[in-house]
Amino acid sequence: VEDKEDYCIYIDTDSVFYSAIPIIQKKYPHIDIKDETLMTSKILEIASEVQEYLNDSYDLFAKKFCNIDEHRFEIKQELIAKSGLFVTKKRYGMKIINDNGVKVNKLHVKGLDIVRSSFPVAFKECLTKVLEDILAGVPMLKINEFILNFKKSMKLKNYDTISMPTSAKNVKKFISMGEGILNAKKGTPVHIKSAINYNNFLL
């Protein structure tokens, strides 16, 4: 029976992410997939074969479909991730163990709040730890316990670490005058509301 399973995990602008486990287990049935060093070695070996095959096929593709003899089409293996969390398009995090053939141990994040400059420092540290724990396979109960402890500690944190470092523009547009105070109109962004409330304390 023809195998029609889709092994592609995620597609980005100019890259694709595939699970190497099915082909590794097919080629090496008795391999210990928990052996990180051995798995990395075998993945690089197979990726090199696939890379060479695809790059050779681009000559035919360029000639037959693009009607050109010379081209710059090239595919290259870059990263090996031990685990990943894909939230939605262009929002994911991965635990990288090999980067262009070099052994590493780092977190690769794209599009998530923890890499945004406007995200509060304390929450950034908290979510980074949560993401690292998820990728490391830490039990959910322990992660939930960490989050609850963080929530309890919020009252003790400096406001500089829990506030949003963002500008407040066009504040007047969201103000409606009340009895000696400034009221925020319906639909006012939260950081603009904060600025309006702060100004009320100065009145």
Predicted segments, located by residue:
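DNA-dependent DNA polymerase catalytic subunits
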Residues: 1-13, 21-203
